[in-house]
Regions:
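Ubiquitin-like/PB1-type beta-grasp interaction modules and other compact soluble beta-rich domains
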Residues: 1-90
Length: 91
């Protein structure tokens, strides 16, 4: 079993249109993201800066926002669902 990552529409330009990605081996959210960065060129620049998530990017594990858990060190296990959700602004 793998960790499923939900990719929002705003980021699909760098994932080749993929809406989901499976990460086979990871024990933290940071490792999940590293797996995505290895797979999708340009994703890191869209969601991270200086080794941390950009402030307008929220990541959820099982519906819980990781900033209220252990951040990038939040534990994940097989079967978990990780959602990346950049904030959308408009006027």
């Amino acid at each position: 079993m793998a960790i499923t990552v939900k990719i929002p529409t705003q980021l699909r330009a760098v994932t080749g249109g993929e809406a989901e990605a499976a990460i086979e081996e990871a024990s933290t959210v940071g490792e999940v993201l590293d797996g995505l960065y290895d797979r999708f060129d340009g994703l890191r620049e869209r969601i991270a800066e200086d080794g941390d998530l950009r402030r307008f990017v929220n990541v959820y594990v099982g519906g819980e926002e990781i900033r209220f858990l252990d951040g990038l060190e939040t534990a994940v296990e097989d079967g978990d669902e990780v959602t990346i959700l950049p904030a959308v602004a408009g006027g």
